[in-house]
Structures are given as C-alpha cells and as structure tokens.
Amino acid sequence: MALNLQDKQAIVAEVNEAAKGALSAVIADSRGVTVDKMTELRKAAREAGVSMRVVRNTLLRRAVEGTAFECLTDTFVGPTLIAFSNEHPGAAARLFKDFAKANDKFEIKGAAFEGKIQNVEFLATLPTYEEAIARLMGTMKEAAAGKLARTLAAYRDKLQEAA
C-alpha cells in the first residue's frame, strides 16, 4: 500500500521519537517467520518494554538521522524490523536472541548502544538493573567480610607479639 507524504512524515517522526528515548536498538530480518510467531514476538516485546516496528529503509534512514542509532544505517538492507529498548539496554537484544534460537529464519542484522555498533551477544548479556545491584551488593559484602578478617588477623598478631 502506497503511503502519502503525511503518513511518511508521521512514521519518520514516530520512529525518531522512539529512537531519541531508547537506550539501544537491534535490527533484524523477519522474512520467513510466520505471523503467529511474529505476534508472539510483539507480545513479548511489549511485556519487556521494547518497541518494535517494521519500517521502510528510506524512512528509517531519515528517522535515525541525528540520533545515537545513525551508525546502523548500513544494516538497513532488505526487510527491516527495528526494536528499541526503552527500560534496559539489553532487553531487545535478549528478546531477539532468544527468538532467533527458536526460529531459524529470523536473522539479527546488528545492534547499537551508546552511538556505536555493538555485538548482540554483548548487549544480551548485560545485567538488568536488579542483577547489577545484586552483584554490587555481593561484592561489597565480600569486601567487608574480607576486611573484617584481615583486621581480626592483624589484631591477633598484635596480641601474640605483646605476649
């Protein structure tokens, strides 16, 4: 279906707004994936805080101009499905990676984070906010326990020297 100029401008503006508010983006080719599977992917994306859209490459190039995702323009070849992670930088990458495992025809073309093209594996393995806090707390707890042990050992050594 042909789009008139207003529709094209609306799509570019909508995608541009999504890109400006996103933490990361992932590009994929969904040729050969059934409608049912794509519906499942879209549902999972909504639940994960990921906005997904199939956009014409020329419109997508214009939409990402001046954003952190301009580096992805070389991947805009063939049918392009773009997903923006709004809450966590690794959400879209994790979603697409899991979906690609279950669907052979789904191909991830590229990903961007902080204005640079990134490996999808890197983005998918980024810890969530809760996981990062838990790791930090674990590190702090280990450091505190280690410091306590060293302090007690030093005190013991001091007492032995005095005796």
UniProtKB/Swiss-Prot annotation:
Single GO term (MF): structural constituent of ribosome
RNA-binding is among the record's keywords: yes
Keywords from the UniProt entry: Ribonucleoprotein, Ribosomal protein, RNA-binding, rRNA-binding
One cellular-component annotation, GO: large ribosomal subunit
Biological process per Gene Ontology, one example term: translation
InterPro entries listed in its UniProt record: Ribosomal_uL10, Ribosomal_uL10-like_sf, Ribosomal_uL10_bac, Ribosomal_uL10_bac_type, Ribosomal_uL10_CS_bac
Record-annotated membrane-spanning stretches: none
Keyword check for Ribosomal protein: yes
Entry-linked CDD domains: Ribosomal_L10
One Pfam family from the record: Ribosomal_L10
PROSITE patterns the record matches: RIBOSOMAL_L10
Function, in words: Forms part of the ribosomal stalk, playing a central role in the interaction of the ribosome with GTP-bound translation factors.
Family listed: Belongs to the universal ribosomal protein uL10 family.
Subunit relationships: Part of the ribosomal stalk of the 50S ribosomal subunit. The N-terminus interacts with L11 and the large rRNA to form the base of the stalk. The C-terminus forms an elongated spine to which L12 dimers bind in a sequential fashion forming a multimeric L10(L12)X complex.
Name of the protein this chain belongs to: Large ribosomal subunit protein uL10
Gene that encodes the chain: rplJ
